[in-house]
A protein has these predicted regions:
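Acidic, low-complexity/disordered tracts enriched in E/D and polar residues
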Residues: 1-29, 34, 67-72
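Long, charge-rich, low-complexity alpha-helical segments
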Residues: 26-72
């Protein structure tokens, strides 16, 4: 399990989306990024589909994931 509390691009609000991690300032779950990428979408398509999310946030989430996996 990744420690999302160390990623500045995301937040967890207990009363929002059952406490799921979301992109900061949005209601878009972080998991939506990975589900869309797994389904064949590109980052550009994801950003088009979820305009409240910025490229910087996506880059930060992907960087955090990569760092977390290489540290494990």
């Amino acid at each position: 399990m990744l420690d999302w509390s160390r990623c500045d691009a995301v937040e967890r609000v207990p009363d929002r989306l059952s406490g799921a991690w979301t992109f900061k300032g949005t209601r878009v779950p972080v998991m939506a990024l990975f589900q869309n990428l797994e389904g064949g979408a590109t980052v550009d398509l994801f950003l088009e589909w979820f305009p409240g999310v910025t490229r910087q946030q996506v880059d930060a989430v992907l960087d955090h994931t990569t760092r977390s996996l290489t540290e494990a």
